[in-house]
Amino acid sequence: HFAVNNQETNRTTVDVECSERALREIYLPAFKAAVQEGGALTVMAAYNKFRGEFCAENNYLVRKILRNEWGFDGVYVTDWGAAHSTVPSMEAGLDLEMGTLIDKYEDWYYANPLIEAVKSGKIPMSLVDEKVGDVLRVMIKTNVLDPKKRFGPGSMNTKEHQQATYDAAAEAIVLLKNQNNLLPLDFSSIKSLAVIGDNATRKHSNGGLSSEIKAVYEVTPLEALRAKWGDKVDIRFAQG
């Protein structure tokens, strides 16, 4: 979710204010790397506002930074219900309204309201051409328009996939405070380790809505602890 989507509470209405330094040093580096180093073809707008404007229509975030500074020429798309306007969204650089909480498709911001905005001169055809170009560019790069170049059947749940997800999870962990130098654990002085709480035995990959997956391979925290240190210390579990 681009960008500064840092809380779930009131995430569709909250107006985030942060300093330029915090924006550049904390919230944007991962997106910048995904675009410039990873070659991301699509970026999804966050639900929240940033400095008074929703992220789907935020000219500073999308037009100035994402497109002009980083050189992103792919598709900028909303999450479901993240669009709030027609003209500001077009001007900021939103390409695709993925879904909107409006009953009729023809009433979505990029449906009849967009047609009327073009007819009335509020939106120039050059902006429409820009959006079409972004979508076609991604379709060409992913071989959607050329069946002969489409990727063949892929693979699922390979050892390489499992290792990649393991590495991503391990490298994403950030230790905020190591009080009294508790870590790393000194097993020469520890006889047993208590793991307390239901989440230690639960698998966590299954979220809701679009984040729901059926993981074939997943390691619970308790399983991981026992696999890593089970031969050094007695690891005991309690539901709590």
Outline where the language-model segments fall.
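Glycoside hydrolase catalytic-domain context in secreted enzymes
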Residues: 1-240
